[in-house]
C-alpha cells in the first residue's frame, strides 16, 4: 500500500538511475505524468496493474483462477404461482431453479387460491431429493405442508408459532406487525426456549417504502443475536426495481456478507429478473471468496458485469469503419 502512494516526483528523487534494468514499472495507482521518468532513466517506464493479484496477467501469465466453489448463503427459490401449476409443472420449474443454484424450492401459496395438490407437490419434490419450503398466510396450508414433509415453513409470527410445534419443519419467523422487531424477538426467544430450530427474517422493504430502515433492522437483529440463522427476501429489490438485477444482487449480497446472513428468498418473475437466481448464486460465491481473502470483490468473476467489461476493448475509428463496411 505504501508503494502505491509513490508519485513520479518521489520516484525521480529516490531512484536516481535504473541500473541494468531495461524497463521500469511503477505501481498502477501511481498518479501523475511518468514521461519525465523515461527521459531521466533512458528506458521505457510503464504503469503496472492496480491490484497485486493482477501481476501474473500483466506479465503474460494466466494466473490462478479464483476459487468460487464455496459459499455460505442458502438460496430459497420461490415458485410464486405454484397453486396454478400442475405437480409436473412445479417439478419442472424446481429443476430449472436448482440448475441455476437454488438449494431450497419454495412453494408460494396465493391468498384465496386453493392449493389442493399441495401435499402431492411437496411429496413429489421430496421424492426427487429437493429441500422444500412452503410460503403461505394460511395455517392450514402450513400444517398440510409440514405433515407432507416440507423442510421449512414461511412465515410464522409469535401468534402462529404454535404451528411449528405441530410439525418437524423449521419455521421462518417474521414480525407479527410490519417493522416490529420486538415481536420478532419474542418469537425468536420462544423458539430458543423450546429448543426449536428456526430462521429469522426482518423483511426487506422496497425502495421508498422503507428500504434503508429495513436494512438497519437486519443490522439490529444480527447485533442482538450474533449466532442465529437469518434470512433476507431479496425479491422486493430485484423484482420491484427497473434496473439490471446483476448490480442489485451484487450490492445485496455484499450487505448479506457483512451481516453474516445465512439464507435468501429469491424470485424470478419479472422479465428483467429472469436470471436473478443464477446471479444470486454467483454473487454469494464472489462475496464469500472476497471475504475469505479479506479483499474487495474485484477480479473474481466478470459474470456480474452486464453492461461494461472490466477491461473494455475499444475499437479505433478506422476499425469501426472497417467493421461497418
Where are these regions (language model features)?
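Catalytic alpha/beta core domains of metabolic enzymes, predominantly
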Residues: 166-308
